[in-house]
Amino acid sequence: MANIMNKTLKTALLVCALLLAAACSRKPSFVSVSDGQFIRNGRPYTYIGTNFWYGPILASDGQGGDWHRLMQELDTLHALGIDNLRVLVGGDGPDGVFSRVEPTLQKAPGVYNDTLLVGLDRFLAELGRRDMQAVLFLNNSWEWSGGYGQYLEWATGEKTLIPLVDGYRPFMQQMRAFQTSREAQELFFNHLKTIVGRTNTVTGKAYKDEPAIFSWQIGNEPRCFSDDPEVRDGFIAWMTEAARLIKEIDPNHLVSTGNEGFKGCEDDMELVERVNAIPGIDYMTIHIWPFNWGWVRPDALREDLDAAMDRTSRYIL
């Protein structure tokens, strides 16, 4: 009888060990795309998301860090059913620049605030504990996190204009140069490789194996800011290179451009199609700015709401 029990126990332990080994060797459930649908765990997948650009700053032990606030906000969002957060990896350039978020992550080319890098790690770990995911964007066509302008400034030494000081039109004209500046683009690509190739110091997972990452986004609203064919070709070329690099380092996660759509492509549907036909781009993004685009009046928001919703529906379709 004892021998039978021992054999049964050994068999049970062996089965448990095999199941545990299989579970440990199984890759996390990354999201994929198929026939215009997100797929997770073999089933169509939908989510509710929001912007949460400052998450890694809150998660850090340095300037701007607030762990209690982060826990409260993540728990509140999770309870509301919001499980996908769009997050800035980190700002570029020195602190103290008007209209730029701070503290910044990349102080100079390849020089990082390590406290914020760990903050990003901790943030992703907390998302994972709640089965939430992040869309991580790496660059920015606008000034508020450095982005195009800071890379150009590092590459050329020319001071970046600030839209709220110098005007949006002069700023956008200056930003066209990023599309054809190989030096500025290389600085960004180096940053991309550093972040996408990182290993999480909290979970021990390489970012490419991190289930808390939903996708990489090349930038926040990347634009070419030009009708010039040469500039547009440069725009497509550097984003093609960025998508290739991300997929080369991390074949597990989705990649998107972060582009606004029609408005982000100089009101040119041909450019929209080119942007979203870039190899390695898994899904299209669209941003809606009814107020900024004049679809609603500041003193008549309620009256204009239905018309704005109609224009939004037509814009998406």
How would you name each of these model-derived features?
Residues C16-L19:
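Repetitive helical segments and hydrophobic/amphipathic motifs
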Residues P28-V296, R302-I316:
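Active-site mouth of glycoside hydrolases
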Residues A2-L13:
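Bacterial N-terminal signal peptides that target proteins for export
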Residues A22-A23:
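C-terminal motif of bacterial Sec signal peptides marking the signal peptidase cleavage site
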